[in-house]
UniProtKB/Swiss-Prot annotation:
Its main location: cytoplasm. The keyword rRNA-binding does not apply. One of its GO terms (cellular component) is ribosome. Belongs to the eukaryotic ribosomal protein eS7 family. Keywords: Cytoplasm, Ribonucleoprotein, Ribosomal protein. This is Small ribosomal subunit protein eS7. Component of the small ribosomal subunit. It comes from Encephalitozoon cuniculi (strain GB-M1). It comes from the Eukaryota. It is found in: Cytoplasm.
Amino acid sequence: MSTQTEAEMSIAGIIRKHAKDISAPPEVFDKISIQIIICDGGEKIMVVKVPRSILHGVQMNYSNIIKAAKQQFHDYYIMFVRNFEAEGGGKTMTKRKAKEVEEVWLANACFPFLLTGTRTDVRGVDDMVVNVLLERRTSLSRAEMDAIGAALHGLLGKNYIVDVNHHTKN
């Protein structure tokens, strides 16, 4: 297993400090990894990949963790997603597994707001866009939604547009 970077160790420390209710062995925190994605406009996105066993604890303590992380990494838009690489053990990605990864990462990237649906718009033979629709009460700015779309593109390789779903009662 590769060693963690200084930033990964720092994020792991923040999670340990603010999510005391996580009952996981200390080595689980060593599986936290970070992927940096830089948008066309120069915005930097830090995608923190956390093991499944602690993701729920991160989400339960999200406001405290994100506040502490932004104090240390103020130049980044930070999001937490499930670390499938830590679970995979080098297995090849099947089509079913790829679909599961996409569905989970879509929901994780939009947290703390609810993903109400997706819609794929086909514009041409090799040109399609996946519209990620969030609950109407979302308070994300247009820039934050664009950052989530760019992060998903960096993670999954498809074009994503994140927007509010105005057609639901949420």
